[in-house]
């Protein structure tokens, strides 16, 4: 293993095919389940969603989202247990979940972000790490953001990677504080969004597969009993 990367390659958590199209709450519950059940080693899995807005544990949905727009456009809503801002995801995004033993959060974020960014550069996208938890293109547009929380003596990092997205739906759903955007020199949500499809000569399914190849070297297949336990945990999300 490369000494630079203490948590990679990780073990790929494989879901049964019937779990490919679930709501966000299912996959967030799966993170918890893996953290609580497999208490040694590093695990990673990817997932995709129908149009969904996921907001942080301390956020007020009506302050972050146009709820009427979401309802009218079939956009699901889910609160995660980590902090951070509200994100919009659809089938052209890749969600990444990393579960590791408890460790220094700053170093984990740095390692994870650099590992992913380095992999994207090898695939042809001119990315770099920005701040603690973002990956951006060389022109400053954001293509990946990440959040973290602690569960059962484990660290859980989850990220959203923008291969492409329905920008108009995203803009309609999200209502960020304009003053906060301006303080960061951002004119609008749209101006800050980058899409990896501009640089990669393959589709989102291929990108997802290549990420797993880059980040893992073994796999763990979840059983039907595992899925039932995850579905029970899913009920704790709203």
Q: Where are these predicted regions, by residue range?
A:
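Short, conserved charged micro-motifs
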Residues: 63-65, 103-109, 169, 204-206
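Contiguous, small/hydrophobic- and glycine-enriched helical/loop subdomains that border
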Residues: 91-133
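Short, glycine/charge-rich beta-strand/loop segments that flank catalytic centers
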Residues: 48-53, 130-139
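Long, positively charged amphipathic alpha-helical accessory segments at protein N-termini or as interdomain linkers
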Residues: 114-116, 123-125, 144, 151-238
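Active-site loop/lid in soluble adenylation, ligation, and acyl-transfer enzymes
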Residues: 1-64, 148, 192-238
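A glycine-rich, hydrophobic loop/mini-helix early in the fold
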Residues: 72-94
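Short, hydrophobic/aliphatic alpha-helical segments
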Residues: 65-78, 146
